[in-house]
């Protein structure tokens, strides 16, 4: 049974890879690195177009996908079509060229986790979170050429960006025409996004997407932006 949240359409010259959903770290997750990387290794096309609409997920799983794309022999073009938030914003930067739809959204913030244990366990977890942040800062800094302290503060603040803003910071290279936001946003719980601390400009983008249009029966299932209680305790997410 094909994976519902990522799809690969291979052709001789160009292959399209669609990453729509939560980025996990096991075979049970919507976008799991093992299946995706196994399929990427079989692609012989000269160009890979990666289409992203994702709320993020596992730091470890996302880093594995980022590295697989970055090290692939093909020329990688990334297209942010709806949302590239959290770990998805890292995967997007694996592209040799990064395109972002004019009505798409880009977000960066700090890794988070939760669990149980004594004070020593939580100190170790805090150290792991600090280490994870440094690995992400390496990627953001390399792509954007922004000062590391500036990016770190943006992560601390949880920064949401329009395409114009993301391009201004150097995270994306080109702004492309609007995509059908209504179709893209059905993959994400847009109401959960609008309930977050978004700038008014980004809330307007969500409203403009006409997300309440009748479903044509062909869209993928809506998947809510995961809460901390829904994630595995032992993993670090972003």
Map each language-model feature to its residues:
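N-terminal organellar transit peptides
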Residues: 1-87, 95-236
């Amino acid at each position: 049974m094909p994976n519902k949240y990522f799809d690969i359409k291979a052709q001789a010259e160009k292959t399209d890879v669609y990453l729509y959903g939560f980025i996990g770290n096991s075979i049970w997750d919507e976008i799991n690195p093992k299946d995706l990387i196994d399929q990427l290794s079989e692609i012989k096309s000269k160009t890979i177009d990666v289409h992203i609409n994702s709320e993020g997920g596992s730091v470890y799983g996302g880093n594995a996908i980022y590295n697989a794309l970055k090290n692939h022999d093909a020329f990688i073009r990334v297209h942010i079509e709806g949302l590239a938030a959290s770990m998805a914003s890292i995967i997007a930067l694996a592209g040799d060229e990064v395109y972002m739809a004019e009505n798409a959204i880009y977000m960066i913030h700090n890794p988070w986790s939760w669990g149980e244990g004594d004070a020593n366990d939580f100190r170790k977890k805090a150290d792991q979170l600090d280490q994870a942040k440094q690995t992400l800062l390496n990627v953001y800094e390399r792509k954007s050429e922004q000062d590391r302290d500036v990016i770190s503060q943006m992560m601390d603040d949880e920064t949401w960006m329009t395409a114009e803003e993301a391009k201004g910071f150097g995270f994306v290279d080109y702004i492309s025409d609007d995509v059908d936001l209504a179709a893209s946003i059905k993959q994400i719980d847009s109401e959960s996004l609008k309930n977050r601390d978004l700038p008014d400009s980004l809330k307007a983008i969500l409203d403009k997407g006409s997300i309440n249009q009748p479903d044509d029966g062909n869209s993928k299932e809506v998947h809510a932006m995961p809460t901390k209680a829904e994630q595995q305790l032992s993993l670090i997410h972003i």
